[in-house]
Amino acid sequence: MDKSESTSAGRNRRRRLRRGSRSASSSSDANFRVLSQQLSRLNKTLAAGRPTINHPTFVGSERCKPGYTFTSITLRPPKIDRESYYGKRLLLPDSVMEYDKKLVSRIQIRVNPLPKFDSTVWVTVRKVSASSDLSVAAISAMFADGASPVLVYQYAASGVQANNKLLYDLSAMRADIGDMRKYAVLVYSKDDTLETDELVLHVDVEHQRIPTSGVLPV
């Protein structure tokens, strides 16, 4: 074989090697694209269940309706004697109340017992007249008429009873933020005196988004 043939054979070998290298690279690129597509689909699936500014998580477990968010307030009942009652109107922050025509879809109450809690309480949320003074007699009658759901919360050795939430759906009533002044959270201490530092009630009001809802609620 003369020098020109040797040079030609060397070039052919290099071409074959380069073609093989390009083929391996193309295969790797294709695999990478497939993997990227799979990861993208997985990310979209996971993202669908995440809270976002437009679709926050309602009460830590269920997402708000599209276009809705929620405002939370905290109530700490004072001492309630055995077989006596406590009532507190829902007073949302002024920054929320100024959008009084925004619709409210649901109210959720979460009962959070403090370490010394050892009682049984009944909890409900009711629409009450503007003239009601939320006296013991008035609250007693509202618990007795069966017009709204009641959560019976009892002492649990674990510290938190599994069923510690009450959901009140207002969608059919077309209630709005302005109407929240007409609603009250009511508590009945059934068997024991409820001390001031025994119970905390977290009230979450799900309503249409307002301009002040610039961050996810906590």
UniProtKB/Swiss-Prot annotation:
Superkingdom to which the source organism belongs:
Viruses
Report what the protein is called. Capsid protein
Provide the alphabetized UniProt keywords: Acetylation, Capsid protein, Ribonucleoprotein, RNA-binding, T=3 icosahedral capsid protein, Viral nucleoprotein, Virion
Q: Which Pfam families match?
A: Cucumo_coat
Q: Where is the composition biased (Basic residues)?
A: 11-21
- Does the keyword Kinase belong to this entry? no
Q: Where is this region: Disordered?
A: 1-30
Locations listed in the record? Virion
N-acetylmethionine sites (modified residues): M1
- State the coiled-coil residue ranges: none
Homology family: Belongs to the cucumovirus capsid protein family.
Q: What function does this protein fulfil?
A: Capsid protein. Probably binds RNA and plays a role in packaging.
Gene3D superfamilies on file: Cucumovirus coat protein, subunit A
* Species of the source: Cucumber mosaic virus (strain Y)
Q: Which residues cross the membrane?
A: none
